């Protein structure tokens, strides 16, 4: 991926990551914790969210190396679980908020692309940009759903599983970072079938 397309991909990825993080802060605030608001993190200003490795360096390396899929992350939006009104239920809602937003973006632009293509209104540029938005957000949702710390999937499971699962979750957390790095390098074969299936279901365009 080179030229203008890689720039669009990068910008869409950054925007999608930021929206993902803002969603955590908004839900935390609605559940009783204003920490993200107080720290100025409920904003689309990228300077408030960018993690230099996760938001810039890693995505750039993956894009320039034509990796099978591109992921990234921003600085986590902080929240105080002690302020949440409904305990673990609130924690679970905060954890899953980013994934829901990414899937919502994929759904909106996937259906938009489907309509435009069906009606013959999609130019090549519009179709390309909409396709990137859908695929980026599907991949981000799937990536964040992985049950490895510090991803949302791990946080969600930690909140909803019974107390007897704590030892298992601590064991997973202990080895999460090396497993996550291995997944980023070799995990495309696992993600691709799911990502392409969801993409095709939303857009009506087979891959």
Residue ranges and their predicted role:
Residues 1-207:
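Hydrophobic transmembrane alpha-helices and their immediate loop junctions
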């Amino acid at each position: 991926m080179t030229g203008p397309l890689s720039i669009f991909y990068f910008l869409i990825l950054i925007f999608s990551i930021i929206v993902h993080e803002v969603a955590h802060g908004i839900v935390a605030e609605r559940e009783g914790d204003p920490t993200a608001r107080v720290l100025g993190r409920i904003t689309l200003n990228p300077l408030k969210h960018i993690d230099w490795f996760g938001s810039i360096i890693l995505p750039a390396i993956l894009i320039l190396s034509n990796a099978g899929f591109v992921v990234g992350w921003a600085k986590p939006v902080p929240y105080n679980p002690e302020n949440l009104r409904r305990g673990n239920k609130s924690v679970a809602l905060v954890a899953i908020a980013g994934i829901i937003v990414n899937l919502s973006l994929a759904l909106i632009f996937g259906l938009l692309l489907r309509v435009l293509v069906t009606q013959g209104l999609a130019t090549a540029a519009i179709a390309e940009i909409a396709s990137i938005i859908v695929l980026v957000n599907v991949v981000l949702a799937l990536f964040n759903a992985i049950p490895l710390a510090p991803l949302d999937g791990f946080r969600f499971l930690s909140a909803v599983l019974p107390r007897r699962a704590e030892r298992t979750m601590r064991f997973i957390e202990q080895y999460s970072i090396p497993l996550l790095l291995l997944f980023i390098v070799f995990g495309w074969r696992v993600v691709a079938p799911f990502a392409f299936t969801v993409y095709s279901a939303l857009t009506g365009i087979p891959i």
